[in-house]
Structure formats: C-alpha cells, structure tokens
C-alpha cells in the first residue's frame, strides 16, 4: 500500500476522532457552572477511590471529566479495531498519542499528529544526506596532510631575499667568522701523531715484525735464540774460530816441505 492510499484511509478516521473530541469538550464546558470555570480542576491519581468531599459541584465536574476520558478511550479503541494489525502499529506510533490523567489538569485532550507530507519527507532526507556528506568531508580533511601549507612554505622558501649593502656586508662577515671557527674546531679535533714524545720514542725502539706489527716478549726471545745458533756458549765458538785459522795458516808450510822431500828421493 502506498503512502497516499494510507493517508486517504486514515483521514476519515482522524476526522471522526477530532469531531468526537470537540463534541465531548463542548458538552463538558456547557455543563459546568460559571463559578467553577475559573478554578482549576484537581483529580486524584487513583481513579478507583472516591474523591475527597469538596462540594457537590466539584464531584459532578470530576465525574464529567472521567466520562470524557472514558469516551475518548472508547473512540480510540473503536478506531484501532477497524484497522489491520500492520496499520495499527503505524497508526499508534506516528498518528495518535493521548495524554494520561495527572494530578493537576483542567481537561482531557487527544493530540493527533499527522505524518509529514511527501515534500517535507524529501527535504528531511536531503538534509540528512547533506549532513552525512559534511561529516565524511570533515573526516577526509582531518586524515589528509595539510598540502596547501606545504606548497606555500616551499614557494616562500624559493623566493629571493633582498638586502641592502650594509646587511650584505654583515652577512658576509658572519659567514667568514663561522667558517673560520669551524675550521679551527676541525683542526683541534684531528688526532695528533703521538700522545707524548717519550711514548713515541719507546714505540720507535720496539722491534717490529711483518707488516710493522709490534712483537710480543715470547716472539722476541725466540728470535734471539735463533740468532745465537746451535752452541749456547759464545767462548767455545770463539776458540774454535782461532784453531781453524791456525790450521789454515800452517797448511802452506807443510805442503812445501813435503814437496822438497820428494825431490831428494
């Protein structure tokens, strides 16, 4: 069932309910006395108990109000019975709402709310869609980096910086002083050739092996023992050298005497 057919079906029911309500209120107002119309009507919360005795007029007014309330409830039940189950839920939720009796009230009234027309529904849907689009755009802008600020920053950095002659001279002077200080610090940070002169001399006296590596104490001792040779006593080696030299010197004289003896024979 379309929305137009539903509205057309509900319209006569609502008009009947409004007419019943208007007739009941008019009869209740006509029956009241002029002296009691200005006073507010008070009704206890418990409808079953008898009201407190405040006069016969007050009792009659409360009975009329109760009769009006019961009549409104009966008309509402009659309308609900004439509808289908699906239409009853729609009608009770969106079209009819009744006010229950309270401690302080003047009269009973039924508040009927009609469903909004189609053009209002379309406007509400458009507003909801626009709100959703705005929320999505806000989230997108928060997640994305600020590209415009980056572009502006690069453009400002690329622009030339104009100065006068005095400012240019001071800029050059500061740059020269900064370069001089950095060079001085760089030289002071360089490693010296040696920590102290005594250590340098000691390193120069130490024996070195292959590749300029310093030899350990065990390596130095092994090298000295290899140089000394097979004999451990240096005196014996010196005497052996003397004996060998004497033998070499006497050999030419012995050969000459042996040759002379051969000639004589």
From Swiss-Prot:
Keywords, sorted A to Z: Acetylation, Activator, DNA-binding, Nucleus, Phosphoprotein, Transcription, Transcription regulation
Broad class of where this protein is predominantly found: nucleus
Modified sites of kind N-acetylserine: 2
Extent of Low complexity compositional bias: 21-31, 86-98, 120-129, 254-265
Region annotated Disordered, chain positions: 1-64, 78-129, 220-265
Basic and acidic residues: compositionally biased ranges: 1-14
InterPro entries found in the cross-reference section: CCAAT-binding_factor_CS, NFYA
GO MF entries: DNA binding; DNA-binding transcription factor activity, RNA polymerase II-specific
Quaternary state and interactors: Component of the CCAT-binding factor (CBF or HAP complex II), which consists of one copy each of HAP2, HAP3, HAP4 and HAP5. The assembly of the HAP2-HAP3-HAP5 heteromer (HAP complex I) occurs in a one-step pathway and its binding to DNA is a prerequisite for the association of HAP4.
Stored PANTHER family: TRANSCRIPTION FACTOR NF-Y ALPHA-RELATED
Name of the protein in its database record: Transcriptional activator HAP2
Native organism: Saccharomyces cerevisiae (strain ATCC 204508 / S288c) (Baker's yeast)
Organism taxonomic ancestry: Eukaryota, Fungi, Dikarya, Ascomycota, Saccharomycotina
